[in-house]
């Protein structure tokens, strides 16, 4: 279950980034994180920190809740 949550969260981050036509490289620079970190997030290999989520939501101009759409915890 935990891995599924990370995967879905990463997928949502990637979808929102692509909607804004921002490359991973540009996104990493904009949120002051490494390209490797962004890649791992989008693959569901790591979980974002609260600070990273905050930065991503500001850069993408969306509410943080958008990253959690479609994630079900049972």
Task: Describe the residue ranges of each PLM region.
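A short, Lys/Arg-rich alpha-helix, primarily the initiator
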Residues: 1-19
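Short, charged recognition helix plus adjacent turn
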Residues: 2-4, 66-74
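Short alpha-helical DNA-recognition segment
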Residues: 21-40
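DNA major-groove recognition helix of helix-turn-helix/homeodomain DNA-binding modules
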Residues: 51-66
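Residues within the helices of the helix-turn-helix
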Residues: 14, 25, 54
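Alpha-helical residues within the helix-turn-helix
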Residues: 18, 29, 58
